[in-house]
Amino acid sequence: MALVALLSNPRATGNQAMLPRVRDFCAAHDDIFHYEVEHADQIGAALRTIARVKPRVLVVNGGDGTVQAALTELYHGGHFRGAPPPVAVLPNGKTNLIAHDLGADGDPIRALERVLALARTDLAPHIVGRELIALSGGSPAGRPVLGMFLGGAGLAETILYCRHKIYPLGLPNWLSHGVTLVLGLLAILIGRRARFLPLPPRPLKVSVTRSGVLQGTFAFLMVTTLQRLLFSGNMPGAEKATGSMQLLLIERSLPALVRALVASIRGRLGRIRLAGVHLERGDEILIEGCRSSVLLDGELFEADTDRPIVLRPTPPVPFLRLAA
């Protein structure tokens, strides 16, 4: 039996430099069971092996895509008898949205030390329930894919632009994201396709249970169960009881984006009505569009007019919150 099981993806951005330190730390602590995978299809076998050591905490060491693949297998695989252990996430990818939401910031080794210290105590005060987004459609996969953050419309095109055009330049993450933000805003300001800018978003139809239908061209589409996201503040409605997903849609106009940005910085997003900014909560969200890209924790899916993407929340899954 191990206190902590660590599932690492050596190909994650941070692990390219950090993994030797992680290996050394695990070698110095017998109560950590370390398993490395290089491909998503290896995660099922990894979790079957990890289940045999009965860890108190499962730690995922990789980017948001690695976390998404692990959560999907953990939820559907049934590898653990009874309830699975709480999940902790190390900040070792490019965006680290999930790790950030769970209070894991800064040095991954410090975060791992914190996990190990908590695993030696009563975990109950540090366990939080998080609903996941179950995505079906937009892929031939037979079972829903699980994640915590979905981006679509102009946001998805901008993320893909950053991934394929900016990251290969080798810039620091903060600078890559800043350059991408500026170019994304420039694309909206110009209002037409340009070779050096992110692709313009395609028209979408978004249906939310109990809230109606939103249709048009949007600069920003986000569905999330995360609570901390924009400027380290809480998502609108995050203080409410669990039971629904949060949707943020911003129309493709610079004034609407500026209004949303200013409201986010001031902590007023969701508290006041803003023209061109739509905030909804729902138990089922349908996204339809002609070959419109969406990204769930970094994995690409495509909505179509005859094959909508359907999002539903899962029951709460236990996570380990590292913040004091």
Model-derived segments and spans:
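ATP/nucleoside-binding phosphotransfer catalytic cores, i.e., glycine-rich phosphate-binding loops
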Residues: 208-215, 231-324
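Short, solvent-exposed amphipathic alpha-helical segments in soluble enzyme
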Residues: 21-24, 75-76, 163-166, 237-240, ...
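Cofactor-binding loop segments of dinucleotide-utilizing enzymes, especially the Rossmann-like FAD-
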Residues: 8-9, 92, 252
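Short glycine-rich anion-binding loops that position phosphate/pyrophosphate groups of nucleotides
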Residues: 63-66, 72, 92-95, 153, ...
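Short N-terminal binding/cap micro-motifs at the start of the first secondary-structure element
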Residues: 13-17, 157, 229-231
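Catalytic core of DAGKc-family lipid kinases
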Residues: 13, 37, 76, 80-219
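ATP/NTP phosphate-donor binding region
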Residues: 1-61, 65-77, 109-113, 119
